[in-house]
Design a protein with these regions (language model features):
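C-terminal motif of bacterial Sec signal peptides marking the signal peptidase cleavage site
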Residues: 15-19
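Secreted glycan hydrolases and related glycan-binding modules that recognize and/or cleave
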Residues: 20-288
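Bacterial N-terminal signal peptides that target proteins for export
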Residues: 1-7
């Protein structure tokens, strides 16, 4: 009889445990705001209008554990986003879905960005191998031509990242710090990119379209905006004024304050402040 009592008790407890739902379910604490098609059309129209733009570098979007590190968490009013965290892998479909929504629906321009130092690149790249071989040549016209070709290959390396990933342009971070790709060499590199993007006065739209089609094929060349991608220089000073005609913007790293445009037109200079610095202060440097 005692045995039966123990068995019944065990069955009761087992039944109670079996009836518990142990599935982990996420709770919807706060639903994101949603907007209609007209809102997004108005947003895109605004970004196409003549206005003072909002620009920012964005990184750390690999975590996805907070709206603060997601593309959908970016302000709707942001005109241009420079993808400082790198280009996500194509397998990361969730991030790419957000990128495309922000890019195509909200109208935010997505830029590939890189610190352009050819000496710092690894030797496994074809452009770096060509560069190393060119540098080893004796001085003369052949060496200059070989170096220029390596700069073109380096430019094409970044062009591929923009066009193959359907991004909206390139942010060339010009901080040479002794790198060979500085001064006139950087200018040559930049102007080669300018054949494919940016406001190049030396090339017609038809010529640019032909170049894009020759390199990437008709499918990519026929995409909306393929001839209108942006080319920007990102620097700590207002040097390289020779590139003004080929640049949409100069992203000036004015982290310590100051708003001197140098020889650059005011409408092409975007003054940038690192909001992560001096976070305990009043951000007064943004307005000096």
């Amino acid at each position: 009889m005692k045995t039966m009592k123990y068995i019944l008790a065990a069955l009761t407890v087992g039944g109670m445990m079996a009836s518990c739902n142990t599935d982990i379910e996420s709770l919807t604490i706060q639903r994101p705001l949603t907007y209609d098609d007209q809102y997004y059309q108005n947003l895109r129209d605004y970004k196409e209008s003549d206005h003072e733009i909002a620009f920012g570098w964005f990184a750390q979007y690999g975590a996805q554990n907070s709206a603060a590190v997601r593309f959908m968490g970016l302000p709707d009013s942001l005109d241009i986003c420079s993808m400082w965290g790198g280009i996500p892998s194509t397998e990361n479909t969730e991030i790419w879905e957000e990128i495309r929504f922000v890019q195509k629906v909200k109208g935010t321009k997505m830029l590939c960005v890189a610190i352009t130092r050819i000496d710092a690149e690894t030797d496994d790249h074809a452009f770096k191998q060509a560069y190393n071989e060119a540098k080893a040549m004796p001085n003369g016209e052949e060496r200059t031509a070989a170096l220029n070709r390596s700069f073109e290959m380096y430019a094409e390396y970044f062009l591929d990242q923009v066009f193959l990933n359907d991004l909206d342009g390139f942010d060339a971070d010009y901080e040479p710090e002794g790198d060979f790709l500085s001064g006139s060499n950087f200018e040559y590199f930049y102007k080669h990119m300018a054949k494919y993007m940016g406001p190049n006065p030396d090339i017609t739209r038809e010529e640019r379209l032909q170049l894009i089609e020759e390199r990437y094929g008709k499918e990519i060349a026929s995409r909306e905006g393929s001839c209108d991608k942006m080319l920007n220089i990102d620097q700590t000073s207002t040097s390289m004024t020779s590139l003004i005609p080929y640049s949409n913007y100069c992203f000036l790293q004015a982290y310590g304050g100051g708003t001197g445009a140098g020889g650059w037109p005011d409408e092409k200079v975007v003054y940038c402040c690192n909001m992560g610095d001096n976070w305990q202060g009043d951000m007064q440097s943004m307005y000096n």
